[in-house]
Amino acid sequence: MRRSSTTSGSSGRQSTMVLRVQDSNKMGLQTPQTKDRGTFGKLSMSKTTSATSERKVSFFGKRASGAGGSRNSQYGMFGTEKIKDPRPLHDKAFIQQCIKQLCEFLVENGYAHNVTIKSLQSPSVKDFIKIFTFIYGFLCPSYELPDSKFEEEIPRVFKELGYPFPLSKSSMYTVGAPHTWPQIVAALIWLTDCFKLYAAMRENPSSFDDGQNWGGETDDGIVHNKLFMDYVVKCYEHFMKGGDTYEELDAEVQSKLKDLFNVDEFKIEGLAAENKRLHEEIARLEKERESEPDRLVSLRKLRSSFQADVQKYQAYLANLESHTTILDQKMKSVNEEVETTEMEVEAMKQENARLQHIFDNQKYSVADIERINHERNELQQTINKLTKELEAEEHQLWNEELKYARNKEAIETQLAEYHKLARKLKLIPISAENSKGHDFEIHFNPEAGPNCLVKYRTQIKAPLMEIVNQTEEEIRKATQRKMSLEDTLEQVNAMVAEKKSSVKTLKEEAEKLDDLYHQKLKEAEEEEQKCANELELLEKHKQLLESGVNEGLSEATNELHDIQRQYQIVMQTTTEESRKAGDNLNRLLEVITTHVVSIEKYLDEQNSKIDRDYEEFMSEDLLSTLTGILDSYKKKAESI
């Protein structure tokens, strides 16, 4: 059984918490046994999460994994302080894993509607409501989602269940949006984890009793037992009371752990030395990785070169084996000839012995001796001549073998180049894209004689010429299509230029009308100012008349009223004319703006459509490639 990696850590660390929150909301402190739909916290029971265990979120946040580790409080997280979501919601791999996990859960639990991973990439609001109702039905079978205000009901349900992160109302309207769906799918995964924990509690309630001694280990190596849980509870109680040091609790749990695991004090020093050595090894490897960031790439290139060398040497060994077989056959025939020659030599020796015996037992005359010497000289000359001819033949045979080896190597090089080009053009093997069921591969067998490659002329040339003709036809069609698209592009460019000139003219007219509007507005303001000045003069005149002459008061008052009525009429007329002119200008500007926007939108759509067609055509434009392929086909066909 593994021990926690940080049990023997520093016991004098200071708390990293900046605030001890006294939360009045007791929702986060409820245990799973409180009620059927109790708070399930953030426990992730799924075993299909990623290999990085740091992404898992435990029931009460991350546990302290030792006496000296940091203990961050997650209690009171439903207060006013906003909790940062530790899950990698911007990681596409994590979101895809959550979608896959949700799809598997729905399929395994008999979801009535058809659902796939593709359909869960961006679901609609109706699909989300159905999925939420289906999952929440396991926790509360009698629950029915109201027809209206679901955008308030669903976040409220999550909040009641203890979901630590807020869900906005606006996110309920845009469930499938790229910026909203990761938060929603993570919340659904949390809800499925709640159901899994709830199901586990119902099936085996004894596993959650306080008196249960757990003997297993988690993924991070913490042993589940009563000793560890008591230590965590005491530390947290001490922390909530204001304590920041835990020397006594650490010493107590260390002594209990030593008794529990039978720790040998002498082995601790050895383990510390081993730990130091491993840390030094890790630092050395990190330095090597920093000094050689591309070492893996260079090693891969070196491995590729070694693999290429191995293939070359294997081919060379195969050639050597075939050459060795040929030499063995030749050596066998030479040995047979040597044996035959030895037998002939033995027979000649016996004949010479017999003749020598006859020669020793008979007497020769001078003429016989001269004749024999003459015949011997002639035979010696014949032997010398045959020896020279044999040496010449052997030299010629050696030259022919060298010439044969060079020709064979040249043929194999050409065949390798041919096979490489054929693979690049997808002509071999038979199942290749461009082979069309024909076998374009050439097998060179020099033992079959000088005509071993003749059969490939009829086997390859006809289908190859057929492919060449088809390629030429495709090139011709592509050229025609390119010309037609270029004509279309020129026409569209001409239309665009014409529309741009029209837009420019309309903009100039709009500017002129705008200037006219401002001019009219300025004239109206000047007229209004003039009337105001006249009114001021009349007021002054009125005051003079009132102070100087009492007799003509009624007459002056009537005159003043007449002038005021005239001023009101003038003001109403001026205001009405200004309003009409402004309305006319506004309507005209709106019409011009709408027309300009529609024309610009149409031009933008046409430009984007033309750009897409042009990019598609340019991406399919293989004229140069097909021309090169055609030339290579012709060269290979002529060489064959």
Swiss-Prot record:
An example GO biological process term is: kinetochore organization
Specify residue ranges for compositional bias: Polar residues: 22-33
Its main localization is nucleus
* Record's subcellular location: Nucleus; Chromosome, Centromere, Kinetochore
Give the region (Disordered) as residue ranges: 1-47
Q: Which UniProt keywords apply?
A: Cell cycle, Cell division, Centromere, Chromosome, Coiled coil, Kinetochore, Mitosis, Nucleus
GO function terms (MF aspect) = cyclin binding; identical protein binding; kinetochore adaptor activity; microtubule binding
**Leader sequence residues:** none
Q: Which InterPro entries match?
A: DUF5595, Kinetochore_Ndc80, Ndc80_CH, Ndc80_sf
Q: Name one Pfam family in it.
A: Ndc80_HEC
List where Low complexity composition bias occurs. Answer: 1-16
Q: Coiled-coil stretches, from where to where? A: 265-427, 464-573
List cellular component terms (GO).
centrosome; cytosol; kinetochore; Ndc80 complex; nuclear speck
How is the quaternary structure described? Component of the NDC80 complex, which is composed of at least NDC80/HEC1 and CDCA1. Interacts with CENPH.
What family does this belong to?
Answer: Belongs to the NDC80/HEC1 family.
The name this protein goes by in its record: Kinetochore protein NDC80 homolog
Question: Which species is listed as the source?
Answer: Gallus gallus (Chicken)
Tell me the classification of the organism that encodes this protein.
Answer: Eukaryota, Metazoa, Chordata, Craniata, Vertebrata
